[in-house]
């Protein structure tokens, strides 16, 4: 490393940062192909087997609990593991389970199989957190995270359209088989493309490469004990816990829309399944711009994620509230509302992860973001069976009250971080 000229180091950094970014963004979008395909298949599966909303919510909630803990423990592993093995391996195993799901029948099978799928899905994002914090300096990470975060929306939008088309023309089982085959191929491509930290490639740490970036404290470096890092930067760090609890409520809104929107739009608003897929794609695609805008604005504000998150959450509350007043048949209006909700929910969803990484430093970043994911998907668990129960007993407005009140609580928690900036 010491023999390389500054020009050579700069060239290699630019090459590897570009390769890491497009690889993990594409890779995580593929993860969505074998996780969110179930949303478009929900109604035909429920119709074929006679499931109630509560029973289908159980499929979603059990799998979400598994995903929450898988993501957390994968985060603990991700701070020490090579990202290429963890991310590519998880995608391959998830794809194989999707193939199996397509042959299934019965509530018990669907619960067990989708829970297994979500166990492997938890390996998708923690490697990305490690790569982001090791390849991009704190001054760049808001924008870099926003670019990577587009993988959520790209994957979600594409699978909503593709799975909707597959269900319409070939039946719900095709919505699991076709994405699975693509992701099997994608897992080997991902293994080839990904790398580890700059130091593993013979390059200096990003703090050294980017002039003016803060140095990491020596006692928190890679050689520090796992328990020491976890205790200092996560367990006793109140700010990581605040944003993690806020994520619990943000995910009730986000996952509620992702998992239940197709069913809601068809049953309550008179949409076809194909039109519902377009509305969900609008939600996802607008989220790309919401996350990019939130990251750029917060970087311009010196790393203050709190004010930007609160602004977005207030507008999210207003957007969800509009759903109460839109009559059935107003497809363009509903598409506009879904576009607004996507923009405003994905901004704070992304900033929560960035803030947790900021507060925990890069050597505990995957663990910290894993904690936000754990709390977030516990919220999604509440949303799964909770939405089903509310819809069965109070209609779809009951679910909207759950989402709007959750957005209010999440906004209040993020307001507590208003003046908090990253830890150097």
Which residues are covered by each model-predicted region?
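C-terminal transmembrane helical hairpin of 12-TM major facilitator-type secondary transporters
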Residues: 304-355
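Extracytoplasmic gate region of multi-pass secondary transporters
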Residues: 38-40, 236-292, 349, 383-384
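Helix-loop-helix hairpin linking two adjacent transmembrane segments in secondary transporters
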Residues: 148-199
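Cytoplasmic helix-loop-helix junction between adjacent transmembrane helices
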Residues: 113-154
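Juxtamembrane intracellular "pre-TM" segments in multi-pass secondary transporters
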Residues: 4-14, 201-242
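Cytoplasmic membrane-interface "Motif A"-like loop-to-helix N-cap segments
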Residues: 80-91, 299-313
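Conserved MFS/SLC helix-loop-helix module at the cytosolic interface between two early adjacent transmembrane helices
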Residues: 69-108
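Helix-breaking motifs and short loop linkers at transmembrane-helix boundaries and internal kinks
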Residues: 50, 82, 103-108, 120, ...
């Amino acid at each position: 490393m010491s023999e390389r000229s500054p020009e050579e180091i700069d060239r290699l950094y630019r090459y590897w940062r570009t390769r890491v970014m497009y690889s993990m963004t594409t890779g995580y979008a593929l993860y969505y192909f074998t996780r969110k395909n179930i949303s478009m298949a929900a109604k035909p599966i429920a119709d074929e087997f006679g499931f109630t909303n509560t029973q289908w919510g159980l499929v979603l909630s059990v799998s979400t609990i598994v995903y929450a803990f898988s993501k957390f423990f994968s985060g603990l592993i991700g701070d020490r593991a090579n990202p290429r093995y963890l991310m590519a391996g998880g995608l391959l195993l998830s794809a194989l389970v999707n193939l199996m799901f397509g042959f299934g029948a019965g509530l018990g099978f669907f619960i067990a199989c989708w829970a297994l799928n979500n166990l492997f899905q938890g390996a998708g994002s923690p490697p990305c957190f490690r790569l982001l914090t090791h390849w991009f300096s704190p001054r760049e990470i808001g924008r870099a995270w926003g670019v990577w975060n587009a993988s959520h929306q790209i994957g979600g939008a594409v699978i909503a359209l593709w799975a909707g088309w597959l269900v319409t023309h070939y039946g719900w089982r095709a919505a699991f088989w076709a994405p699975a085959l693509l992701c099997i191929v994608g897992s080997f491509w991902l293994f080839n493309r990904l790398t580890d930290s700059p130091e593993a490639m013979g390059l200096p740490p990003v703090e050294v490469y980017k002039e003016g970036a803060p140095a990491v404290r020596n006692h928190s470096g890679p050689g520090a004990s796992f328990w020491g890092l976890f205790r200092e930067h996560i367990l006793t760090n109140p700010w990581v816990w605040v944003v993690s609890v806020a994520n619990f409520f943000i995910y009730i809104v986000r996952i509620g829309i992702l998992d239940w929107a197709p069913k809601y739009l068809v049953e309550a608003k008179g949409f076809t399944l194909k039109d519902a897929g377009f509305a969900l794609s609008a939600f996802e695609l607008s989220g790309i711009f919401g996350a990019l805008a939130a990251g750029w604005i917060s970087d311009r504000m010196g790393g203050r994620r709190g004010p930007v998150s609160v602004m977005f959450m207030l507008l999210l509350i207003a957007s969800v509230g509009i759903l109460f007043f839109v009559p059935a048949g107003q497809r363009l209006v509903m598409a506009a509302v879904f576009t607004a909700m996507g923009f405003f929910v994905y901004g704070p969803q992304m900033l929560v992860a960035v803030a947790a990484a900021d507060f925990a430093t890069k050597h505990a970043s995957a663990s910290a973001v894993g904690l936000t994911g754990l709390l977030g998907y516990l919220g999604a668990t509440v949303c799964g069976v909770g939405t089903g129960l509310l819809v069965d007993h109070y209609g779809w407005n009951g679910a909207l009250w759950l989402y709007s009140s959750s957005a209010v609580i999440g906004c209040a928690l993020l307001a507590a971080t208003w003046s908090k900036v990253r830890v150097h």
